[in-house]
Amino acid sequence: MPELPEVETVRRGLEPVLSGARLARVRANRPDLRFPLPDGFVQRLTGAKILRLDRRAKYLLVPLDRGDTLVMHLGMTGRFEIAAPSGTIRPGDFAREVTPDDKHAHVVFETEDGAVVTYYDPRRFGFMDLIATDKVDRHPWFAAMGPEPLGEGFDAKTLVAAFNGRKQGPKTLLLDQKTVAGLGNIYVCEALHRAHISPFKPAGMIAGKRLGPLTTAIKDVLAEAVEVGGSSLKDFAATDGALGYFQHRFRVYDREGQPCPTPGCKGMIGREVQAGRSTFFCPVCQV
């Protein structure tokens, strides 16, 4: 599933084409994705002007001039492709012929200046909804969500409060969207390794002085992943069709049995399953 860096990569790819654009035509090739599309989906979007493109955790938020916000989640295999007007070159575009009868091309957005943005989703785990803009923050998807890890609202104090007295491991708590928004399995494994913290140690037993470095590791890992376009595992690609490259920088994720890259550490990367997800770690330098 695309995590925060992948969704941010998609947002940045769509922004030059959609921000400030007016939707001349919207086509929904089926009535549902993971959930049914909202009533009047096509009619409510057609003719609307896109004010900007935002991201909250792993959601794309598209406020419109009509008072609605288009909320989109990529699920497991959702992706966008962009075809710009002939002769127009824009950052993030993937110039290709759009195939209207592609069975996985579920929603097509056409702007007044001729750009075509197509949403593909073979497994249909993604979804789209329209929510009144002034109610987005109170919507059940967002109301209890923690701070953005790349924002100023996330710091060591956030983790001190979240970890205090807790018996669960830090990975479990970091994956809880109420603690911090948008973190997923890959980047939590990587951040814990950089901070040399065991994913299995009860969070309440981790000294407070270690949470500053963990906060920094989380921010650094995410920022580096965004910079190189995320991690291309299985189905993810950016809007220009390019693959992300952060997977080439993994220190522990998907590296079971390989030497730990920490200088001076002689450990081997291990893997254990926690709550149905693989946890990659070094048993020597993560304590």
Curated annotation (Swiss-Prot):
Protein name as annotated: Formamidopyrimidine-DNA glycosylase
Domain of life: Bacteria
Zinc finger extent (FPG-type): 251-287
GO molecular function: 8-oxo-7,8-dihydroguanine DNA N-glycosylase activity; class I DNA-(apurinic or apyrimidinic site) endonuclease activity; damaged DNA binding; zinc ion binding
Cofactor(s) required for function per UniProt: Zn(2+)
InterPro entries xrefs: DNA_glyclase/AP_lyase_DNA-bd, DNA_glyclase_Znf_dom_DNA_BS, Formamido-pyr_DNA_Glyclase, FPG_cat, MutM-like_N-ter, Ribosomal_uS13-like_H2TH, Znf_DNA_glyclase/AP_lyase, Znf_FPG/IleRS
Membership in a protein family: Belongs to the FPG family.
Sorted UniProt keywords: DNA damage, DNA repair, DNA-binding, Glycosidase, Hydrolase, Lyase, Metal-binding, Multifunctional enzyme, Zinc, Zinc-finger
Example GO biological process: base-excision repair
A family per Pfam: zf-FPG_IleRS
Source species of the chain: Caulobacter sp. (strain K31)
Paired cysteines (S-S): none
PANTHER family: FORMAMIDOPYRIMIDINE-DNA GLYCOSYLASE
